[in-house]
């Protein structure tokens, strides 16, 4: 987008901002450009992002006074102006960064635990569940396990989750963890965010998301000890629930392949194996 158009959009939110340069962000997974720009200004750098109404609702409803999110300076006709967060993502995970992310997640989820009065804000259960239910017919021989996941999705306690909290949506800035891209944020089953954040971590150095197996295990245990235990959920029940939500993350690639008719992708081959392994572990072989 031309810088003059960017200036026009930003001026509708803050006429005092003087933009000197703009640079489009690129996606970590494929290098394509987002509709997100880093703006160099006469003072502090900013970010302009193309957004949607659920994301705007989430920022305004859950973070009016801040939180593990960028500070927002304004919205205008599908655009959001916010602070630029320097740092690095969780895509090359280390234990220190993981703890920062877990603490930020736990604090926000504790604040909004069982807040059903806020369920209509953003992309909560009422919007998410029907779309997940539609995937059932694409689950090949894994429908029974997927039905068990749907049962858990309906029944477990809910809290604030970013249901797209992939590692590149977690920025570590000093001693602060910041969560980005809240298009799929709202009051959802509690495991959604953690499962999304750690399910795809691999120990291969060239992996899209590098995370040691011991750190994945550590995250599951840390989350229980610092939040879920306090909510009265038995450990065994928690572990089974987390496995179902990990299964959902892997089965997403089965859905994508069957919905598109394209079974040639590496992710389909890899994650269908992992989904079946988890289903067997859960007793749905």
How should these model regions be labeled?
Residues 1-17, 268-285:
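Regulatory N- and C-terminal appendages and interdomain linkers associated
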Residues 17-40:
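ATP-binding glycine-rich phosphate-binding loop
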Residues 32, 43-80, 91-107:
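A conserved alpha-helical element in kinase catalytic cores
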Residues 33-40, 149-192:
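Active-site acidic catalytic loop and adjacent metal/ATP-binding pocket
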Residues 83:
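Conserved Hanks-type protein kinase catalytic core
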Residues 88-124, 139-144, 153:
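Conserved kinase catalytic-core helix
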Residues 193-231, 246-264:
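Active-site activation/catalytic loop segments of kinase-like enzymes and analogous catalytic loops
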Residues 231-245:
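All-alpha amphipathic helical-bundle segments outside canonical DNA-binding/catalytic cores
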